[in-house]
């Protein structure tokens, strides 16, 4: 039997050098680490890793080749009260594995035990890691590096975006390949999108609870192997990496960036009753935030929280991010529950992972977007991230919905959100683009559902409608559900137009949820994380071409307005913005706080957004000059000069002079 050589302690993971494979694994508390390799017949061969450099265990297997399947058995104490849960009866996934073979099924053998260890061997059913060799021709690929001020983000799910697209070949729908298909790229280009933000593509598992109900984790926020692509989105699992890179290369050629939603806050091992896949059995005490009683700090709502202040975990997370940039040429990241990244355990802007990213010549050059909260005390950190980060702006989301759908927001508060929420983000040398403005996202109502439902309808999720937020700031316009009279449909359409216009013509970085531009509905489900079906897949055959054209026209209009593209904070008298009342006069303090919901926003001295958010048709006197309505609010031919706009109830219009 071949013996392992000592090998070397870096880099982490399994790496083929042309003559064999070097294996490395971090564990500060292990007493012994076995490398387990499996031949074509599934026969297991075990090797003790002979090298032990600090907290890194390592060994070199001569003559090993790409395609080799492997895992680890890690020996150490079973001391739950101290946070140690070693169990060598369980085969473990390499945290840095780049491909996984097998499925993460709900099986008692994939659990280590709660108070007492489960010593039943699980190698026969446990997923295995696969050694991967990296040879890929990027040709002349170069990142688009779209300036933040010019960025338009489109948030989409790999499968849901294309699975029902009639113009994409059936055999590649719902896959990485489909993202790079000319039909999809042309659509994004015509819409005006500059960055495609993908929900998680790293290998994830469906929670046992969902599997027992016949459901699955659709969104992917339950990671198990952060370096490996989720194989279900590939035409062939063996070629997933190349399929993904082909798509990125094609998108880059079209000038479209790719941003990955990445989950560094927790793992699919969940709470202490959850499965044992990897980190818990490798070094539970180091990888997770552990309470004094040995249980987990659950600051994520998912059962556990990664300890991103531990030096080894910081190295692991940093290596993971660098891998996606260097190996896959991604252009940035959106970090789920990103407040966890700054916990020490209190949140700090100079937390170790933030500092590592700031000092990394690779990671400091890509787009970084934070979901700036977690569920722990002190977890709401909107506006408090380091300068390199942009942040999801929930202030904007709630303000836009309240203004147009609940009618209870003063003009001053609305204007503050329209101006990139400068009260929140204008600090630490940050620019307006730090505010990622959104009206909807993957979690919550779709845009159409915002105007069709007053209440969530999540019964299909199997939690008796308890899941999902109740604070939707939605308005069904008088009837719960889709459909209705022509008048109802038109009023809902007008509200959608108003929300889209507010999103796409505000200062800051706009993010559009895929499907909102053509009226996608989830039938009132505002937490469709476990709905891998027609509820979430975009139905292109039912798409509203009129709404799509309206959205595209708004995006292209945005690109013509210097005040929105220059990414500079607006200052009084700089010519970027003027705020006027219905008579084209500056608003008084009382009007800002208590006045009627009528406002004119003059941008770059040439573009005028006239707003009447009252219940009555109102005459709006435009500023001096020859004004004409412009697309998408009027045709391009034969512009009509006007000095007064008869503003319909809850309406708006954009003019140019």
Swiss-Prot record:
Keywords: Carbohydrate metabolism, Glycogen metabolism, Glycosidase, Hydrolase. The active site is at residues 336, 371. Pathway: Glycan degradation; glycogen degradation. One of its GO terms (molecular function) is hydrolase activity, hydrolyzing O-glycosyl compounds. Signal peptide: none annotated. The record marks 443 as: Transition state stabilizer. Residues 460-479 are annotated as: Disordered. SUPFAM superfamilies: (Trans)glycosidases, E set domains. SMART domains: Aamy. It catalyses: Hydrolysis of (1->6)-alpha-D-glucosidic linkages to branches with degrees of polymerization of three or four glucose residues in limit dextrin. Its EC number is 3.2.1.196. GO terms for biological process: glycogen catabolic process. PANTHER family: GLYCOGEN DEBRANCHING ENZYME. Belongs to the glycosyl hydrolase 13 family. Removes maltotriose and maltotetraose chains that are attached by 1,6-alpha-linkage to the limit dextrin main chain, generating a debranched limit dextrin. This is Glycogen debranching enzyme. The lineage of its organism: Bacteria, Pseudomonadati, Pseudomonadota, Gammaproteobacteria, Enterobacterales.
